[in-house]
A protein has these predicted regions:
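Cofactor-binding beta-sheet edge motifs in enzyme active sites
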Residues: 1-15, 22, 28-375
Length: 375
């Protein structure tokens, strides 16, 4: 139970911590600052751990998404969604859900996305809601299409709904695969027999569905999110005690993000958060003086590049709630893990050289000040 009275429902944090420690031999390495290698000279290596948690698709008030799924004359499908793919793979995930529900290949799905003139309202690409909120809206719309396909097929094949299955763009009678109708034929039958119905489905999904709009703003009490993601991260850093230069050499993320619909995209999100935390920890800082920005260009404001990246490893923790039932019960992934790896980096610097820094970025100057080598 959280301080606001919310119930996290499902938490894999303990398992995340245990797996992260085991995978990195954390207990064996921590507290034993050591040279990075036999020939590294003044470079010391340390290890640190951090944990994080984040909401899924809600912030201050509930958010919602709507989608439409339409069967085309040739048996392919068009998905209409307001979801915006900014590189996180939202379009891929949403098409995967349609493909799974309707048992057809991904190449048979056309997606029309983020066109405010033609697509329904969407939560947007923020607060980690695309896979959970928009994904469930797509599931609902796809389910409506599936039910219409089954209903038309049951009438034409003179079979009960319980005896019908979807397979390879056909509806067939279980145990009698020769008794089947293609999606293309079912669309034609629907238009002929059902007043031109082209077989369409609409889906709507809202977060914290049982709560009123704008819940508990005055008291901060109540339900704020359907679920919370958890993670534990371990960082290994190397610090040069003569120059103060520090770098991240290894990052391990063990996450409880519900059921990973697309593990490759999950790993991409994790790599992204490691990169963001790397910039936060060692480089990025807006310098201000008398209301003016002193480093307004990319020459002065440093950000990580491919040359600064560290080895990143990702381990899934799928808790029992998500292994049994509740389809597409994803949690947040990527956005909230920046805080965990940042804390791990800070703890690793402390483990390496005994300097506890409370201000980012951890520049050579701040590390050398902590070591007492400069004032």
């Amino acid at each position: 139970i959280l301080p606001n009275g919310d119930d996290v429902n499902n938490c894999g944090l303990t398992e995340c911590i245990e797996k992260a420690a085991e995978h990195t031999q954390f207990n064996k390495k921590y507290g034993r600052s050591r040279p990075a290698s036999a020939s590294s000279g003044p470079v010391r290596r340390g290890i640190g751990i951090g944990v994080s948690s984040y909401i899924t698709g809600s912030l201050i008030y509930p958010n919602s998404s709507s989608t439409m799924v339409k069967m085309n004359d040739d048996g392919t499908v068009t998905l209409l969604t307001g979801a915006l793919d900014i590189g996180q793979g939202a379009e891929t995930i949403l098409c995967q859900i349609v493909a799974e529900e309707l048992k057809l290949p991904m190449e048979d799905i056309e997606i029309i996305a983020a066109d405010t003139e033609t697509t329904p309202v969407d939560i947007g690409s923020w607060i980690s809601g695309n896979a959970f909120v928009t994904g469930n809206a797509v599931r609902v719309a796809s389910t409506e299409v599936r039910e219409k396909l089954l209903s038309i097929a049951a009438e034409k094949l003179e079979a009960s709904l319980e005896d019908l299955v979807l397979k390879d763009k056909h509806v067939q009678v279980a145990g009698s695969p020769s008794r089947n109708l293609s999606y293309q034929r079912l669309v034609a039958l629907s238009i002929q027999k059902r007043d031109g119905d082209p077989i369409m489905g609409e889906g709507h999904w809202r977060t914290v569905r049982g709560e009123p709009y704008h819940p508990s703003l005055a008291t901060t009490k109540g339900r704020w999110s359907d679920s919370y993601a958890f993670g534990a991260q371990v960082a290994e850093v190397e610090v040069d005690i003569e120059t103060g230069l520090a770098r991240l050499v290894r990052a391990v993320t063990v996450h409880d993000c519900g059921f990973p619909i697309n593990p490759t995209l999950v790993e991409g999100q994790m790599d992204g958060q490691v990169s963001m935390a790397l910039g936060h920890a060692f480089m990025e800082e807006v310098l201000m003086k008398e209301g003016r920005t002193l480093n307004p260009s990319w020459l002065d404001y440093r950000m990580p590049t491919i040359h600064n990246t560290a080895k990143s490893e990702v381990i899934d923790v799928i808790t029992e709630q998500y292994e049994i039932g509740r389809p597409y019960r994803t949690k947040e992934v990527g956005e909230g893990y920046v805080s965990g790896i940042l804390a791990a980096i800070a703890n690793a610097v402390y483990d390496a050289v005994g300097v506890r820094l409370h201000t980012t970025p951890f520049t050579p100057e701040r590390i050398l000040k902590g070591l007492g080598k400069i004032k």
